[in-house]
């Protein structure tokens, strides 16, 4: 049997004990970057945590194209009590709300996990220092559908502004009065985009389509963007009618929206966040809402969301939380971290995640490696 050994194959110990052949499970494997399986052999096992029906649907469509990969889907999310379920798996796959702190990483290391596949763009919930220390690699799915998130940001802005969600309910109850449905024009108003990565750029283009003037703030301005004007953060806050957050969660951006920055905003501003909940200091936002600073607020992400997001809590009594306080305000519109949730995005997530796994498996270059 010919054996083509790929460079830096992370599964060397497992796959080159051929003289023993205690099990025909690996018999006939030929290794190369383009031909990494033969005779239906399983090369890599992945445990998917926090799996929803839509996750399975999109991954199972693509799995036949990756016959060297075996996966198991479980509903439980990963945390200290469930990390040990990864015993016997080469990799785990997790989502944005997973607990991947130091204790969990240490347990994954004890169970022999070599790779963490994040089926999302963000990884601020992963303890990268510990994964590096334990030799566990982390891959993600960058930019799987910037347009999906940007479109949802504008949908939130429009819904919060024009009260379409309330109008729908009123009409279903045969109430066609217009009381409480007054909005404002976006045309010829100023949109302030904080963060001009792919999503921020997509949002800027959408705002331009509404006839808005688009200004932006970013720590690293992109001089090639001719459809917006970069300004200082203070100028953006003080002149924008619509502010949309599209920056990553970093120590520099945590609680970027706080009492000080809110005070600099125009009265009657509309604020939208589809990026990370920690960008906004929620207590300060609530104080601003009570002071009538905001015409409307649209939130797809929020602090404390990890305990509730993606779960059906409709039959539960939630403990006192900032989420409940936000929901009590008539000018706040909230959705359940669904900005990414389109057919195109889920297809891209599944494909990129499996490609990340394949690249790791055969020792190819990993384009989406965090470290």
Q: For each predicted feature, which ranges?
A:
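An N-terminal-biased, well-structured beta-alpha scaffold segment characteristic
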Residues: 44-138, 258
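Short glycine-/small-residue-rich Rossmann-like dinucleotide-binding loops
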Residues: 96-97, 241, 247-249, 275-276, ...
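Structural alpha-helical scaffold elements that stabilize or flank donor/cofactor-binding regions
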Residues: 84-85, 235-236, 261, 325-326
């Amino acid at each position: 049997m010919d054996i083509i050994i790929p460079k830096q194959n992370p599964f060397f110990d497992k796959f080159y004990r051929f003289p023993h052949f205690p099990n025909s499970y690996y018999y006939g494997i030929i290794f190369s970057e383009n031909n990494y399986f033969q005779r239906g052999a399983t090369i890599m096992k992945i445990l998917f945590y926090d799996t929803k029906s839509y996750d399975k649907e999109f991954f199972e469509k693509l799995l036949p194209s990756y016959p060297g990969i075996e996966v198991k889907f479980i509903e439980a999310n990963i945390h200290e009590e469930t990390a040990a379920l990864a015993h016997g798996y080469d990799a785990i796959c997790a989502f944005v709300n997973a607990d991947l702190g130091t204790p969990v990483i240490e347990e994954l290391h004890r169970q022999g996990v070599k790779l963490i596949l994040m089926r999302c763009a963000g990884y601020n919930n992963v303890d990268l220092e510990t994964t590096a220390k334990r030799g566990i690699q982390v891959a993600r799915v960058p930019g799987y559908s910037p347009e999906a998130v940007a479109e949802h940001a504008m949908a939130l802005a429009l819904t919060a502004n024009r009260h379409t969600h309330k109008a729908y309910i009123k009409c279903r109850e045969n109430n066609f009065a217009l009381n409480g449905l007054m909005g404002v024009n976006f045309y010829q108003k100023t949109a302030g985009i904080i963060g001009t990565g792919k999503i921020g750029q997509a949002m800027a283009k959408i705002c331009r389509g509404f006839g808005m003037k688009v200004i932006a703030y970013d720590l690293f301005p992109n001089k090639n963007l001719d459809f917006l004007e970069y300004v200082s953060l203070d100028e953006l806050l003080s002149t924008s009618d619509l502010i949309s957050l599209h920056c990553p969660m970093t120590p520099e951006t945590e609680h970027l929206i706080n009492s000080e920055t809110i005070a600099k905003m125009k009265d009657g501003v509309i604020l939208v966040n589809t990026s990370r909940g920690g960008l906004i200091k929620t207590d300060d936002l609530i104080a601003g809402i009570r002071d009538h600073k905001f015409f409307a607020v649209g939130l797809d992400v929020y602090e404390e969301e990890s305990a509730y997001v993606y779960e059906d809590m409709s039959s539960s009594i939630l403990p006192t939380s900032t989420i409940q306080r936000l929901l009590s305000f008539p000018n706040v519109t909230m959705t359940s971290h669904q900005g990414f949730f389109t057919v195109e995005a889920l297809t891209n997530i599944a494909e990129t995640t499996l490609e990340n796994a394949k690249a790791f498996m055969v020792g190819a270059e990993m384009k989406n490696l965090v470290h």
